[in-house]
Amino acid sequence: MKLTVWTYEGPPHVGAMRVATAMKGLHYVLHAPQGDTYADLLFTMIERRDHRPPVTYTTFEGRDLGEDTAGIFKVTCQEAYDRFKPQAIIVGASCTAELIQDDPGGLAETMQIPVPVIPLELPSYQRKENFGSDETFYQIVKSLARPMDRTPEVTVNIIGPLALGFRHRDDIEEVKGLLYEMGIGVNVVAPFDATPEDITRLGAAHANVLMYPEHAESAARHLERICGQPYTKTIPIGVAATHEFVAEVAQLCGVEPRKDLSRLRQPWWSKSVDSTYLTGKRVFLFGDATHVKAAARIARDEMGFEVVGLGCYNREFARSIRELAREFDVPALITDDYLEVEKAIEDASPEMILGTQMERHIGKRLGIPCAVISAPVHVQDFPARYSPQMGWEGANVIFDTWIHPLVMGLEEHLLSMFREDFEFHDEAGPSHHGGHSPKPSEAARTPDKVEERADPAPEAPQTGSDVMVWLSEAEKELKKIPFFVRGKARRNTEKFAADQGLQEISLDTLYEAKAHYAR
């Protein structure tokens, strides 16, 4: 264990919470101390759900450890059933409660509760949140789903979307639209908005559409084995992947692969005038494996970007990410340490980051534009509007999301370049007022002060700005370098000056460093 200010994944019982919160008629009884009771905060503040998560805690205290904590669990479990009357109950322990080894599953089985009670064995000190969600959904499906007659019409189950997922709500609607265009019905969507009764009907579908392997691949494999239902392997994120997804579903279900491309604008926009100064931009990708794999191919094949680094935080998918990295001829970063991610991004010096909420913070620190492509995300990535990532509309949304940081970044660079111009400096009036604009002050014509938005300082103290003095002329010239490579230029210049034994960086030093590293 280690102390950190950020984690990409919580303990596995958080994954179980996400499944329980996504479903209806299911209740989660969690054996946990007071400090582990944060589900309400996760789902009502961040995801802005209009109801509290169906989680009941035993909330034992330190003084209870010398008494019967197992008895506390049994009382809590019975009270939860009496109050909420769920169709099924899942029981488990938090990472802290796991240490006292009360066996919530075994205790619940002795209580004669008249609904299915599904025990969860989630090893908190070996696995993490995505494993918890995958294992929880698998145990629910294993306990409730059975083989049955197929529906008369061709139908599929959509499995994988859950609470706190990145655009899961909107992705469901987009995937449904793709299926309806081919005349394929939807039998059950699970776990999102499904009840335990719905889970018992999973076996009636002809196939399963697996939206997010992180959360439902174990369940999909189980249904394939027990119910004879094949499942899709293609994730429809991006134009090419959506075409492949439609073809795969059509083949599994034996229907014609019909497509309505009238809503698709991304290919035209990516070929438009805007793209002439976006092609070849260097991007770094990090997030969950599903979204990183999709984003890497979109970046290279549909946007014309150059992928300079990629990685994921969920080690269960490390092998596939390493294979992808070999395809792109870049190193694979498999880590859940945000400091390692920041170091890799700083070393790669990309022009844009595609990542999670943490990469958004890293981008701000390093002065690099960032677009969010993967959970974990904060409240701004649970929009009220329709904003999918999958399907045709998802391709449009992705184009806007990725391009706008670059466009606005270029605009910001132009503004900073011309800030000292006699016509555009901060104290000049609106340019369309002509001769009525006030004259620039002497200070505005010769600004010596440094902008408040400082460039990120490098980590290495021997080459950092704490031992180097930048003269005003060199500082002003440095600001003319685009912000997305300015940090690298600063570091190279300071390293060059340190190698030359210089304590001050003049305009000549800057030019000499540029010539040195251009060789």
Curated annotation (Swiss-Prot):
Sequence segments annotated as region (Disordered): 426-465
Cofactor note: Binds 1 [4Fe-4S] cluster per heterodimer. The cluster is bound at the heterodimer interface by residues from both subunits.
InterPro entries, per database record: ChlB/BchB/BchZ, LI-POR_suB-like_C, Nase/OxRdtase_comp1, P-CP_red_C, Protochl_reductB, Protochlorophyllide_Rdtase
Keywords per UniProt: 4Fe-4S, ATP-binding, Bacteriochlorophyll biosynthesis, Chlorophyll biosynthesis, Iron, Iron-sulfur, Metal-binding, Nucleotide-binding, Oxidoreductase, Photosynthesis
EC number: 1.3.7.7
Pfam families: Oxidored_nitro, PCP_red
Catalysed reactions, semicolon-separated: chlorophyllide a + oxidized 2[4Fe-4S]-[ferredoxin] + 2 ADP + 2 phosphate = protochlorophyllide a + reduced 2[4Fe-4S]-[ferredoxin] + 2 ATP + 2 H2O
Compositional bias of kind Basic and acidic residues: 445-456
Cofactor: [4Fe-4S] cluster
UniProt: substrate binding residues: G409, L410
Pathway terms, separated by semicolons: Porphyrin-containing compound metabolism; bacteriochlorophyll biosynthesis (light-independent)
GO MF entry, a single one: metal ion binding
Protein residues bound to [4Fe-4S] cluster: D36
Active-site residues annotated for this sequence: D274
GO biological process: one example: light-independent bacteriochlorophyll biosynthetic process
Protein's job: Component of the dark-operative protochlorophyllide reductase (DPOR) that uses Mg-ATP and reduced ferredoxin to reduce ring D of protochlorophyllide (Pchlide) to form chlorophyllide a (Chlide). This reaction is light-independent. The NB-protein (BchN-BchB) is the catalytic component of the complex.
PANTHER family on file: LIGHT-INDEPENDENT PROTOCHLOROPHYLLIDE REDUCTASE SUBUNIT B
HAMAP family, sorted: ChlB_BchB
Record note on quaternary structure: Protochlorophyllide reductase is composed of three subunits; BchL, BchN and BchB. Forms a heterotetramer of two BchB and two BchN subunits.
Family indicated by similarity: Belongs to the ChlB/BchB/BchZ family.
Protein's UniProt name: Light-independent protochlorophyllide reductase subunit B
